[in-house]
Each structure stands twice: as C-alpha cells, then as structure tokens.
Amino acid sequence: MPIKIPDRLPATDILRSENIFVMSEARAATQGIRPLKVLLLNLMPKKIETETQFLRLLSNSPLQVDVELLRIDNRPTKNTPTEHLDTFYRQFEMVKDRNFDGLIVTGAPLGLVQFEDVLYWEEIQVIMNWAKEHVTSTMFVCWAAQAGLKLLYDLPKRTRKEKISGVYEHKIHDRHHPLLRGFDDLFKAPHSRYADFSPSYLAEHTDLDILATSEVAGVYLASTKDKRNVFVTGHPEYEVDTLHHEYIRDCEQGIEPNMPVNYYPDNNASNTPVASWRSHGHLLFSNWLNYCVYQQTPYDLDDFSEANFTKNDE
C-alpha cells in the first residue's frame, strides 16, 4: 500500500522515481480504507532531505499511511525555504486537539547542547507529554531518543568524548519481539552522535526492553513494554551519502572529525560508500507500523484510551 503525502511535496517526485507508490490526496479520498495517521516532527535543519528519508521508510508497508509534517516552531531556517514550511508543515496548535496512530520525532544537531539550553526544549516537553494522551506509539530517533529518555525516565544527558560516526554491527537480544521480526541475528546501522547509550546504564535505570546493541555504539533499539515508546539511537533513515556529507561538512568547519568507520571501501574517503543497512531500516519501520501502531490503535481515533494498549505482545 502507498503512503499519502501532501500534493506537490518535493519528496513525491523523488519517491516515484524510485518506484515507490505515492498516493495523491485526491485519490486517497476515494478509497474506503482508514489510513494510519502518522505525524512526523522534523527537527533537522535540512527538512526536505530528512522528510524524504523518513517517507521512504514509511512507504515499505502493506498499510496505507497518511503522513503529516510537524515543525517545532515558526522560527525561520536558512536550510529550508519558508514557502516549503508554510505550505507543507503544521504547527502544534493545529494538531493538538487530534489523535494520531503514530508519531516520529527525528534527530537534531544538538549533541553537545544541554537540554535546558535547547531553544525549543519547552515545546519538546509539551509535545512529548501531549503524545501520551493522543498517540498510540511514538518513535524517538537519535537525539530525540535521548530527549525521550530524559522526559520519560529523567535520565541525565550522557555524552562521549568523541563523536560516534559510521556503520556498526548490532546483535538482537529477543528474536521473538515484534520489532525484531524478520531481523538477522546480526545487522548493520549508521550512527552519528555524541550521545552515550550504555546497555548496562539503561538496564539499571529503566524498565525498557533492550532489543539490539552494538559493542561499540551501545544500545541501538529499545522499547517500553507496551510498545508505545520506541527508541532508535542510530539513523536507519540515512541515505548512502549522508555520513559522507556530514564528514565533509565537519572537515570544512575545521572540526577534524574521525573518518566514519566501516563506511568507505578500503577506509578511503575518495571511494564511494556502499549502503549495508537499507533492508533492516525498512524492516524496522514496517514492524513498527504493523505491531506497535496498527495492531494497537483503535479503528476510531476518537476512541483513543489507555485501555487499548497491552503490556505484552499476544
């Protein structure tokens, strides 16, 4: 089934060129199907690039998904045209009285910024608290995972001395968990962060199901037992050249970053990277939509209630 996105969104032509079924709003209105309502809170500076990456992953599902784009505030951004934001993005005041099947909160380039110093930290808290009463399942990605752990478990910000950047191997810890269905025992995923997600620390201070970890990068995937909050510390949405562009950007800014590991053939930045994480990225989002969202959400979103959710997969 397709994803339904706003007409004229730049991602439409990109996704269609990749043979991804994108449905127009007009056509979707004629189908007798209740699509899943998913809200994408895009915190990244390059919003068009990021929205396209996430829409690509949301498209690989037999479920029809109606995606709405959300911005954190109305501050102008130098990386995304104001016209694009005004045309395709909603502000929180426009959606706060509605319920949604799913919410995705993207990462943000705030790895070394303390939570209280984030310009929109108050808005983030409001939206995450709102989601408890209005969203069936929320996925927190990278920086958002750290923010979610702070707000849900009051975990302090933990950072590494050096940024983790590259493609890391992970192992799964519960092959029967719905989010891991179809996963290989070992799989790869990109990381680009300063945040530290120690498996032992999360196990000691939370009741999360720790589902996948890396010896180097730490926890990659974790979930609350009711599957209403899913934490992804890496970037399964990244395109093959995203880490490359970040590396070149940091070099040009004089940061002297370490080269992304397990990324460039022969560890040579002049060689074209090869993506080794796409299949598991698509599978993760498909499993989230199916098992955390579709199988738990009410048919009528007006019937949203805590009673709809179970603690364990049946």
Curated annotation (Swiss-Prot):
Active site: 142 (acyl-thioester intermediate), 235 (proton acceptor), 237
GO cellular component: cytoplasm
Catalysed transformations (reactions): L-homoserine + succinyl-CoA = O-succinyl-L-homoserine + CoA
Pathway: Amino-acid biosynthesis; L-methionine biosynthesis via de novo pathway; O-succinyl-L-homoserine from L-homoserine: step 1/1
Residues spanning the signal sequence: none
GO MF annotations in UniProt: homoserine O-acetyltransferase activity; homoserine O-succinyltransferase activity
Swiss-Prot/TrEMBL keywords: Acyltransferase, Amino-acid biosynthesis, Cytoplasm, Methionine biosynthesis, Transferase
Positions annotated to bind substrate: 163, 192, 249
The keyword Cytoplasm is annotated on this UniProt entry: yes
Pfam families: HTS
Keyword Acyltransferase: yes
Record-marked site positions (Important for substrate specificity): 192
CDD domains: GATase1_HTS
Location(s), subcellular: Cytoplasm
Any Gene Ontology biological process: L-methionine biosynthetic process from homoserine via O-succinyl-L-homoserine and cystathionine
Positions of the record's site feature: Important for acyl-CoA specificity: 111
Stored InterPro entries: Class_I_gatase-like (IPR029062), HST_MetA (IPR005697), MetA_family (IPR033752)
Highest rank taxon of the organism: Bacteria
EC numbers, comma separated: 2.3.1.46
Its job: Transfers a succinyl group from succinyl-CoA to L-homoserine, forming succinyl-L-homoserine.
PANTHER family the record matches: HOMOSERINE O-SUCCINYLTRANSFERASE
Family: Belongs to the MetA family.
UniProt cross-references to HAMAP family, sorted A to Z: MetA_acyltransf
Name of the protein this chain belongs to: Homoserine O-succinyltransferase
Lineage: Bacteria, Pseudomonadati, Pseudomonadota, Gammaproteobacteria, Vibrionales
